């Protein structure tokens, strides 16, 4: 209850860099909307970030790797 969250969207490397940045933002917005629907207070969401394909956690050379790169991350910051 004492945390703020920034929602960070990521993609794999398929598609152009511009497309992937927009896709990662849409992904973050979609998760934000779902969290609000589930009752998270809007003031808890302090930001949305679109990282596109820039920060892969796995290789984009395999389907499994691409699947891992299509993700959302939550950055939590404790409220004072």
Regions found by a protein language model. Name each.
Residues 2-4:
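A general structural motif
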Residues 10-80:
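Periplasmic OmpA-like peptidoglycan-binding domain that tethers envelope proteins to the cell wall
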